[in-house]
Swiss-Prot record:
Belongs to the TPT transporter family. SLC35D subfamily. This is GDP-mannose transporter. The keyword Membrane applies. NCBIfam families: nst. Residues 1-39, 90-109, 151-159, 221-232, 295-302, 348-381 are cytoplasmic. It is found in: Golgi apparatus membrane; Cytoplasmic vesicle membrane; Endoplasmic reticulum membrane. It comes from Aspergillus oryzae (strain ATCC 42149 / RIB 40) (Yellow koji mold). It is a multi-pass membrane protein. Residues 61-68, 127-133, 182-199, 254-273, 324-326 are lumenal.
Length: 381
């Protein structure tokens, strides 16, 4: 499953996780097994480009599949992605490229509730992406950062600085502009205006639910991970492995598997390309995790956090390039404001983390991934 969407979308005090995620990872994933360095692998430009390319690839592939005529096999899509991810990381582990712990029934029992939250997060995200354009989807994902940040304040003793609060204001403003631009375009375009507005409203509702599910997933993972000390590839392994049986049951019971619906979701002319996109979207989650580790290893967590903020621009632009997202002054303005809000937020976190920590309880946490930060917390206790 595309858990990394969470990942790169949320650089927060406690973890950064996406659209990860998210991805859900936001800063320093576990480092793969070290290999002899070379001038190519040590070049910081290459991992940054690989990370950005992986993020764009995952978003575009998901949108391609979900933008089909009345595509309604979302649980099946997530199941395929999870299976592909498990096969990929098992292969990488066998080849010595990555390492993670073996399956444990006790650890699986502790982690299962988090996998259920992840399913909710990814499913609602897929529904939102189905109804909204990539630029609008990317902009609204920023709102999850606000929910997570204040969840940190309530439950983990975090804090919100003035500059951070300003970035939140820009995020809200960009979302308002994006929604206004979408509705304005729907009203002014030809065709059934009421149907287009209804589609947008459905997308906004799914986006709201997705923001709530994502913040619940991240904050819940922060607590649960203390019981397991998981690293990032451990979380990827258990999240996808535990999700597969649940998704198989959900797709079998809740989705229409009649021959007519299968033909509608997988038209004969596009069947091969749709299946290829589904497989590639599953692989892209592995690419994101690996390139995240590569990026942090050859640069720094600070550089990585800035790359995550800057990465929102090419992801949003990919929707304008590869799909029929409207290119208007309001829509471009929303992307620009959202882009600036991400940069301001990253700068605010860097400045906050640079301040000396005083007192027993930390008021800010490093820009690291959920698994890494929570493991440190458990070691302190």
């Amino acid at each position: 499953m595309v858990e990394s969407k969470k990942t790169d979308d949320y650089a927060i005090e406690m973890d950064k996780i996406d659209q990860g995620s998210k991805n859900f990872e936001a800063a320093a994933p576990p480092q793969p097994r070290s290999v002899p360095s070379s001038s190519l692998s040590g070049n910081p430009v290459l991992p940054v480009l690989a990370y950005c390319g992986s993020s764009i690839l995952m978003t575009v592939m998901n949108k391609y599949v979900l933008s089909g005529l009345d595509f309604n096999l979302n649980f099946f899509l997530l199941c395929v992605q999870s299976i592909v991810c498990i096969i990929a990381i098992q292969t990488c582990k066998f080849c010595g490229l990555i390492t993670y712990r073996d399956f444990s029934a006790d650890e699986a029992k502790k982690w299962f509730p988090i996998s259920l939250l992840l399913i909710g997060m990814i499913y609602t995200g897929s529904k939102a992406l189905q109804f909204l354009s990539i630029p609008v989807y990317t902009i609204f994902k920023n709102l999850t950062i606000i929910l997570i940040a204040y969840g940190e304040v309530l439950w983990f003793g975090g804090s919100v600085t003035g500059l951070t609060l300003f970035s939140f204001g820009l995020m809200v403003l960009s979302s308002i502009i994006a929604a206004w631009a979408d509705i304005k375009h729907a009203v002014e375009s030809s065709g059934d205006t009421s149907a287009q507005v209804s589609t947008l409203n459905a997308g906004y509702i799914w986006m709201l639910i997705n923001c709530l599910c994502t913040s619940s997933y991240v904050l819940g993972m922060r607590k649960r991970i203390k019981l397991t000390n998981f690293k990032d590839f451990d979380t990827m392994f258990y999240n996808n492995l535990l999700s597969i049986p649940v998704l198989v049951v959900l797709t079998g019971l809740m989705e229409d598997w009649s021959s007519a619906n299968i033909d509608r979701n997988f038209p004969q002319a596009d069947r091969s390309s749709i299946m290829f996109a589904m497989i590639l979207s599953g692989l892209s989650s592995v690419f994101i995790s690996y390139t995240s580790a590569w990026c942090v290893r050859v640069t720094s967590s600070t550089t990585y956090s800035m790359v995550g903020a800057l990465n929102k621009l090419p992801i949003a632009l990919s929707g304008l390039i590869f799909f029929d997202a409207p290119v208007t002054f309001p829509s471009v303005s929303a992307i620009a404001v959202g882009f600036v809000s991400g940069i301001v937020y990253a700068i605010a976190k860097i400045k906050q983390n640079a301040k000396p920590k005083t007192g027993v309880l930390p008021t800010s946490n490093p820009l690291v991934s959920a698994s890494s930060q929570s493991m440190r917390d458990s070691l302190r206790s």
